[in-house]
Amino acid sequence: MHTAPSCNPELLQSSSPGVHIVMEGREVFKYAVKAMEEAVLALLEQEQVSIDAISLVIPHQANVRILNKLVERLGIGAEKVVINVHKYGNTSAASIPIALDEANRASRIQAGDIILLCSFGGGFTWGAALIRW
């Protein structure tokens, strides 16, 4: 594709293969969950921190289904996870800072807490970080 359909109205009507961007949602979902889970587990092993030592998890707020599946696979209680995607939608790179600020303002974070941040985003990039508050 050489141009976005919105720039060329004829492309909006086209059913030709290769003209429109297509996302394989199920595959992206599976890959996102797997990539974040692996990043989190590798980080915890590297830093010698157990999952039980985590006080709060603040994941990228892309999709509540991805968040729920990640939490399930990691065995983290829902009470330890900040989810606000239902309030703001996917705010892209701002989702973790917004959720961190909300958790702090709600006194969900105390001095000395270990906070897990994890993300998966456009371009198939992902990562995880630990913060001691």
Located regions from the model:
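Conserved beta-strand-centric core segments of catalytic alpha/beta enzyme folds
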Residues: 100-133
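Short active-site-adjacent structural elements
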Residues: 65-68, 93, 124-126
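Active-site-adjacent helical/loop segments in soluble small-molecule enzymes
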Residues: 84-96
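Hydrophobic alpha-helical segments
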Residues: 73, 77, 88, 102-106
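Hydrophobic pocket-lining "lid/loop/helix" segments that shape and contact the acyl-thioester
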Residues: 1-85
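Buried hydrophobic packing segments
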Residues: 40, 96-103
